[in-house]
Amino acid sequence: MLYLFIDVLSSSGLYISVMITKIAININPDDTDSFPLLDSIIDLLDARNVTVMLPEHGNLTDKYPHRVKDNETFIREAQVVAVIGGDGTFIRTARLFSGTGTPIFGINRGRLGFLNEFHPGEALSFIDQLVDKNFTVSPRMMMQASLQRDGEEITRIDFLNDAVITKGSFSRPIRIRLEIDEEFLSCYSGDGLIIATATGSTAYSLSAGGPIMVPQDEHSYLFNPICPHMLAIRPMIIPDVMILKASIVSEFENLLLTIDGQVAIELERQDEIRFKRSPSEVILVNHPEKTYFEVLRQKLGWGVNRNDTG
């Protein structure tokens, strides 16, 4: 993978050295309350002689006809991508630009906003710094799910956060067989299975009792059984060089494989899903004033006074 932006590697990330002349902005087009912020960003970038590109969509095409680009141009020509919205919009954008090496940052207009680190009130000042090349980036690994049915690959898809195997409308538990590098690990009954990257460890997996993984750990991922009817089986972190295979043992239908909470794939009995590290990754722009652990404190409400010693 070739990064045209990288100049110097430091402990805080990768410094950017290329002059920024084109920025793509992805926004939830139905969130018209975000349009005033978008207008302010466009005005700033126009004043800095930076071209703004927007994706094709009815609302955006009507309001910004000269800035809308087709999907291919939007992806190919962007030097940096700004996302206005919640984590869902960010993940959708990240998957769109995965493997391109294009840095992405998010301005939070949603609720929790783990990935959208920038608040609307600080967006303009940061974008001004960004145009002056005053920012760093960090890579985030992605995982790949390959669905095998009757010995043939049905689909292959990458994910940034997590992939989840769940039952549909049935209340009965499902049975899943797990293997790591073709070695049998366990066969359990439960509500499903979560496979998460370090980035996704603070999403569904965290709610299901999984551990938090620091995203800078780019060499491992986790699997987390959902409500297993087996006290001994617990979440496990495994190296990214290992392949996890989950086989569907349940006899009833209406099972789903959900990718990043956005793509749902129906599963059948004896389907096999192989999970491994994807060759693609996502490049995130670092917040200049916040560390990962500060974001954790804020987003998860830990909020302990740092001067407390007891």
Task: Annotate the PLM regions.
Residues S34-F35, T89-A94, T202-S207:
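Short glycine/serine/threonine-rich phosphate/pyrophosphate-binding segments
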Residues I157, I165, F170, D181-F184, ...:
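ATP/nucleoside-binding phosphotransfer catalytic cores, i.e., glycine-rich phosphate-binding loops
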Residues F97-I107, F114:
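Gly/Ser-rich helix-loop-strand patches that form or flank binding pockets
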Residues D87-T89, G110, T199-S201:
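Short glycine-rich anion-binding loops that position phosphate/pyrophosphate groups of nucleotides
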Residues C187-A232:
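Gly/Ser/Thr-rich active-site loops/lids in small-molecule metabolic enzymes
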Residues Y3, L14, V18-V80, I84, ...:
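ATP/NTP phosphate-donor binding region
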Residues L112-D191:
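Catalytic core of DAGKc-family lipid kinases
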